Amino acid sequence: SNKRCNIYNQGVRNRILYREEELSAGDMLMITKNNYYWTENIEGIDFLANGEIVEVLRVRREQELYGFRFCDVLVRSLDYDIEFEIKILMDTLYSDVSGLPRERAEELFLNILEDYSDISTKAGKMKKLKTDPFYNAVQVKFAYAVTCHKAQGGEWSTVFLDLGYISEEHLGINFYRWLYTAITRAGKKLYLVNLP
């Protein structure tokens, strides 16, 4: 679950990497929602894909605005080995869901839309919104531990699979499909944790 991933991510950051800051250079982040805004002018990258991992190279400016927290960071795409600047939405880092919940996304939308109240047409407001860096902030989570859903399509040499909180009523066909997907993410080593 996202909740368990948050616990593991904090454990890795605090006890293995000795990171005390909320976000540090060297942190690995996973994009949790496709984003086209920040790569428009970067040759070779069409968009930041849901599930893509980036490394934080430098943490720049943090801001609180519209009832949300943002941070400008310099990142490197692991897929393309290209460095670029993005604005991330800090509120998604520790959220117990994969991205920004619908109610909070709507709140962000409406709060930013107020900045364009001087524009009379809805189309004009939407055009401005599409170019707003805060509205287009990248939704991310730490990438040291990820859910099986987010891991689909990827492979890691070593995988730790937490089977805690699996009760007998979950042991149906969907569980075995999930288990197959999780097991096949491991390229070399698989460790089963919290076996029932």
List PLM regions with ranges.
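Core RecA-like ATPase module of SF1/SF2 helicases and allied nucleic-acid translocases
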Residues: 2-195
